[in-house]
């Protein structure tokens, strides 16, 4: 599961993933976090 701070971050993450980037790289680029829990710790998943 990925958690992003805002819609822009989510869009960057999704575009990066669609382009073939790894979850770790895309999360780093977009400011998102990859977590194993089902809910995001510090901000809602949009």
UniProtKB/Swiss-Prot annotation:
UniProt entry keywords in alphabetical sequence: Disulfide bond, Plant defense, Secreted, Toxin
Pfam families in alphabetical order: Thionin
Listed GO biological process terms: defense response
Annotated InterPro entries: Thionin, Thionin-like_sf
Compartments, as annotated in UniProt: Secreted
GO cellular component: extracellular region
Similarity annotation: Belongs to the plant thionin (TC 1.C.44) family.
Protein name (Swiss-Prot/TrEMBL): Viscotoxin-A2
Organism the protein comes from: Viscum album
Taxonomic lineage of the native organism: Eukaryota, Viridiplantae, Streptophyta, Embryophyta, Tracheophyta
